[in-house]
Amino acid sequence: MKHLFYLLSFMALTNCNSNPQIDVQGHRGFRGLFPENSIVGFKKALDIGVQTLEMDVVISKDNKVVVSHDPFMNHEIALDPYGDTISKEKELSFNLYKMTYDSIKQYDCGSKPHLRFPKQQKIRVHKPLLDEVIAMAEKESKGTTFYNIEIKSLPEWDTIYTPKVDTFVDLVLELIVSRGISERTTLQSFDVRTLEVVKKKFPEIQTALLVDEFEVIADKMNNLSFKPEIISPYFKLLNANTVKDLQSKGFKVIPWTVNKEDDIELIISYKVDGIISDYPDIVLNRFSVR
């Protein structure tokens, strides 16, 4: 019965012409129900009415921009080319920055059951190129999709798991510009170095400062030399007053990753500008039934 209810709800969303007052972003595509950062997940997100696709990018050995949350094959989602599991102890050795993209494509990142997302469909998928994701989204949406792209950099990863920040940013910007989507793209990062380089190289592009659960929003903002358009904190760092204060200073507030219905309702009540969720269907349904 629950499965039937889910199917009916999904079909209703697919045919729904709701117009949410906030930016509903599909986290890693549609991770709650489809493999993360996959073409199929991004397409399903667009199918139900998501306007902004949120994703992460890393760099391969041959300087391809790859859509992946980690710069290695995460043991939670990846199977090796022989269909074998990868242990947590060995996952870091499957370093994407040391692998060509042809090698990366041989790994299945969707068939393994995801323990934290039991409703996620098991589909054989590979990590796509950013260019592939953009090509699909532009075709499906006729050039109306927005992109929120996280550049996955950390100081300790430089030259080991990722290129130096300047090179990393250049590769991402080159692709965004060549695809003509810069006006519909936000570049986000937890790494303030990366945002500084983005701002220097392409001051017109929108940026978002990510703040994790162990950081203080104000302290993180003080580490930047400029004012980003968006502050994107872990959702539990927010309350109504914090949101109001940030917005009064000219920032948009788009928290992550809001998945439970009660949390979604609470965050919406704060009058945020957007919500990043693994379950964009739940967020969109909240608007369609009101």
Identify the meaning behind each predicted range.
Residues C16-R290:
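Phosphate-group recognition and catalysis centered on beta-loop-alpha active-site segments
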Residues M1-D23:
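Bacterial Sec-dependent N-terminal signal peptides
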